[in-house]
Amino acid sequence: MKKPTSAPRSKAFGKQRRKTREELNQEARDRKRLKKHRGHAPGSRAAGGNSASGGGNQNQQKDPRIGSKTPVPLGVTEKVTQQHKPKSEKPMLSPQAELDLLETDERLDALLERLEAGETLSAEDQAWVDAKLDRIDELMQKLGLSYDDDEEDDEEDEKQEDMMRLLRGGN
């Protein structure tokens, strides 16, 4: 058997053309130029690395330890132990003094006026008012006072005044 004949080969598979010295030099320069741009910027080791690439952020990234103005003790000194002061407790007021304080409380008066005007208070304000009014009731019970006593005194005074008018007018 005979082998089939193949088509003639093109010149591409034949001898390759050799590059001239100038072409080789030019390719080498191009490769060197590309290689130069790899790696870190010159002086980055001494400058701190990121400062070369982000020049605008130097003020924000300053180390706070550099340039500190606080004095540093140079010798060995004994530690000064500060004595812990216990928190002073609020002095206990007498029930009468506490009641007077609550009755003259400006915030409580303002909130009560708003309630009487028909406004609705926030939950915090309403809770605060309720707590203060409850405390006033407790103090009045401790002291033996009540709202009714004041009203009865007023009624008695009015009755006496009416009696005096009648007596004077009747003469």
UniProtKB/Swiss-Prot annotation:
Comp. bias intervals (Basic residues): 31-40
Key word Transmembrane present: no
Region (Disordered): 1-99, 145-171
Presence of the UniProt keyword Thylakoid in the record: no
Listed Acidic residues bias regions: 147-160
One Gene Ontology term from the biological process aspect of the record: ribosome biogenesis
Composition bias type Basic and acidic residues, residue spans: 20-30
GO function terms (MF aspect): GTPase activator activity
Entries under InterPro entries matching the protein: YihI
Keyword vocabulary terms for this entry: GTPase activation, Ribosome biogenesis
Listed Pfam families: YihI
Purpose: A GTPase-activating protein (GAP) that modifies Der/EngA GTPase function. May play a role in ribosome biogenesis.
Family that this chain belongs to: Belongs to the YihI family.
Subunit composition and interactions: Interacts with Der.
Name of the featured protein: Der GTPase-activating protein YihI
Organism: Salmonella typhimurium (strain LT2 / SGSC1412 / ATCC 700720)
